[in-house]
Amino acid sequence: MLKLLSLFTGIGAFEKALERLNIDYELVGFSEIDKFAIKSYCAIHNVPENKNLGDITKINIDKIPDFDLLTWGFPCQDISIAGRMEGIKKGTRSGLYYEGYKILKAKRPGISIIENVKNLTSKRFKEQFETILKDIEELGYNNYWQVLNAKNYSVPQNRERIFIVSIRKDIDKNNFVFPSPVELKLKLKDLLEDTVDDKFYLTENGIGRLIKKNNKLLKDCQNPNIS
């Protein structure tokens, strides 16, 4: 059975993918610090909280059991266009990449899968992206990467992400390809109800309060002394 170590776990998207692909796996551990994500993850995947290795910067690598697959989507805040774009450097959230890399280097599983924002492949971060590929290749892996959009895989969401699949050279058959797009059959109109519950409509009093509030905002915006 496939043995999995999950880093920067969140609520376990990779685990859900394995489940949907009917791939049996044994979780050797996961690393997550957000208390709500931890509770959600354990409930969704029926995992005891003592499987959580906690803060990735404090993990004792020597105590991690051997595993076959490493999944990690290190923080994107310093890469994302919505963040400060400081890049992957120590001291930043995205710099936690190096913590994941240390585990990969020490354990050398058969397969590593990294997920992150598309902006990692942009001109601004090209050098850092190439460094990641070089780092992993020097550990004895072949890298395969591609930017995929969720909407092309039957998910009603326009979300682009880069996936880096790294396969250890001694087991790589050099035939890995990313999956072909899947038609998106579920549309917004399929989710909308023909009849809407009255609770979703504003009452006459509610409409009046909204108009009054908007009028006040409009008046404030027209005030030349507003700061």
What does each model-identified segment do?
Residues 58-61, 150-155:
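A short acidic, often aromatic-flanked loop/helix-cap motif at beta-alpha or helix-coil junctions
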Residues 2-108, 118-122, 126-130, 137:
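Core alpha/beta nucleotide-donor-binding catalytic domains of modification enzymes
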Residues 53-54, 118, 140-152:
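Conserved S-adenosyl-L-methionine
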Residues 32, 115, 160-161:
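Acidic-residue sensor for enzyme active/binding pockets
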Residues 71, 145-147, 161-165:
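Conserved hydrophobic/aromatic beta-strand scaffold that supports enzyme active sites
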Residues 1-27, 135-139, 161-227:
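S-adenosyl-L-methionine-dependent DNA methyltransferase catalytic core
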Residues 110-114:
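Conserved beta-strand signature within the Rossmann-like core of class I S-adenosyl-L-methionine
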Residues 66, 156-161:
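A short, glycine/Asx- and small/polar-enriched loop/turn
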